[in-house]
Amino acid sequence: MRDRILAAVCDVLYIDEADLIDGDETDLRDLGLDSVRFVLLMKQLGVNRQSELPSRLAANPSIAGWLRELEAVCTEFG
């Protein structure tokens, strides 16, 4: 799951993993995440925009935060 999130983030934000200064806790807004790119990432990750998940992801815009939220959703429904 982490690799999928990382690949999507790197693709949409045009960054490399080395740009994550604080590792997976790096605030993606510091790397160019804005509302348009957020929507692109939600599409790329297959997140249902009608669910509450996008707002939970927006509250913690980091790879680590997204991994926690997405794994929790997979556990809830898995």
Swiss-Prot record:
User: Which keywords fit this entry according to its UniProt record?
Assistant: Fatty acid metabolism, Lipid metabolism, Phosphopantetheine, Phosphoprotein
Q: Which GO terms describe its biological process?
A: fatty acid metabolic process
Q: In which pathway does it act?
A: Lipid metabolism; fatty acid metabolism
InterPro entries hit by this protein: ACP-like_sf, PP-bd_ACP
Signal peptide coordinates: none
Query: Which parts of the sequence carry O-(pantetheine 4'-phosphoryl)serine?
Result: S35
Instruction: List the Pfam families.
Output: PP-binding
Query: What superkingdom does the record give?
Result: Bacteria
Can you give the residue ranges of the Carrier domain? 1-78
> Which SUPFAM superfamilies does the annotation name?
ACP-like (SSF47336)
Q: Which family does it belong to?
A: Belongs to the acyl carrier protein (ACP) family.
Report the function annotation for this chain: Acyl-carrier protein (ACP) involved in the biosynthesis of a unique class of isonitrile lipopeptides (INLPs) that seem to function as virulence factors in M.tuberculosis and to play a role in metal acquisition. Is the dedicated ACP for the loading of activated acyl groups catalyzed by FadD10.
- Name of the protein in its database record: Acyl carrier protein Rv0100
Q: Which organism is it from?
A: Mycobacterium tuberculosis (strain ATCC 25618 / H37Rv)
Species classification: Bacteria, Bacillati, Actinomycetota, Actinomycetes, Mycobacteriales
